[in-house]
Amino acid sequence: PRIIVEDDIIIFPDSSKYETYNTTGVWEDNFGNYGIMKCLVSQFINSKQEITLDGYCEANDHRKEKFWMSLKRNSFNKAGVGKSKYIFTETKYKTLQGKECPYAAQLIEGGGVFKLKCKITNDEYNILGKQND
């Protein structure tokens, strides 16, 4: 999958830096859903290369159903694992409203991967997975 990244960087005298990204790419979850996600992300990397990342995303799945989420991470620059939170949801994703889920992200040349993995009940799974046929 192709990912578009537009970024801006401020570098401080101690080599720490503040970066912003405007990304669009492909996402998938552990219920069989997938689609396109647009994210606005900021990260601060201190002089010890420790990272604090915050972002907000708008996602459309393969059936044009939407949700919005926040991202937080304190790991690698171009890849890492963090926490996402569903902050607004539509239709079948309403069952995830307010839920926090781990995610993994990896930017690679010419593409990217964003994977959500939520722990949910059987009832929630039936709601989220039943419309994927």
Region spans (language model):
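Beta-strand-enriched cores of mature, soluble protein domains
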Residues: 1-133
